[in-house]
Amino acid sequence: MCDDDIAALVIDNGSGMVKAGFAGDDAPRAVFPSIVGRPRHQGVMVGMGQKDSYVGGQAQSKRGILTLKYPIEHGIVTNWDDMEKIWHHTFYNELRVAPEEHPVLLTEAPLNPKANREKMTQIMFETFNSPAMYVAIQAVLSLYASGRTTGIVFDSGDGVSYTVPIYEGYALPHAILRLDLAGRDITDYLMKILTERGYTFTTTAEREIVRDIKEKLCYVALDFEQEMQTAASSSSLEKSYELPDGQVITIGNERFRCPEALFQPSFLGMESAGIHETCYNSIMKCDVDIRKDLYANTVLSGGSTMFPGIADRMQKEITALAPPTMKIKIIAPPERKYSVWIGGSILASLSTFQQMWISKQEYDESGPSIVHRKCF
């Protein structure tokens, strides 16, 4: 399926980033922010030919004069008009394809409401005239990308995190746990603790700078208390970062205090369990006979699992919770930022998958509810 003529399209719509490309490729061709920006003031500059909305990178680069909105909140689409703009931009500007010529594989959050799947299906067939489409659960695709069909996926992106136990390719809905703690919260927390150090970041534009600091300098400590002592007694953990205006700031214990919130949500004033405990709780909701397979196949996925040190810390924390002789293995593939997309690319190019597509004809006969019968 390497010729782009009839290749299926794979679009992973995350809360923070859209990953899009062609089935059979090993990485997405287009990765851009899931944002739609509208001008704050009508016609700031005369004769600019201002558009009424900008999507993705265009919105990002003009963020000074725009109000930015994310149509996907906590992994779930909340604004369909803006979502349509994002898809339109994906097809026509990023991938430069005619959507009516390619089957399209979309991804959805675990526990996505039924009405949402139907709406997605409807838009693909009615607005974009897709010849065929399919909706797959994000975590399941990540597991496929790691070469497994059984395991538990901890998927953490920008807007939401999930633990999803999967057995023989099927997600076990009763054991899926959702954690409203993800990249955006960690960025906000870093903004807050940098403010305590005397650096203020407040606007949406400045938040993007902080996100960059987070991605470049933060890491997860194996032993938080000990790391705090090291940071207090020496400057070995300090790193400097140059802001766009040339000012250089120094950050020390913030580097690991910030992602520590994943393990201790109380840092953010949240009462929920940390990611290690959530994983453990999710496994404990599964049948006792498959727990061994889940402990031995714990797969990390999504951009917020990219912190250095997260896998070792996860191993340590889950080992402490699990039965003493249990074999625990945390799998953290280097490309996990894109593993949902990669899994989709693998799935959509399998010869056995070709009969799974929902065709335009089936949609015309059954309507949007066809998605519940064909995608699960």
Swiss-Prot record:
SUPFAM superfamilies: Actin-like ATPase domain (SSF53067). GO terms for molecular function: ATP binding; hydrolase activity. Its EC number is 3.6.4.-. It is found in: Cytoplasm; Cytoplasm, Cytoskeleton. It is an enzyme of class 3 (hydrolase). The keyword ATP-binding applies. Transmembrane segments: none annotated. The keyword Protease does not apply. Belongs to the actin family. Actins are highly conserved proteins that are involved in various types of cell motility and are ubiquitously expressed in all eukaryotic cells. This is Actin, cytoskeletal 1. It comes from Lytechinus pictus (Painted sea urchin).
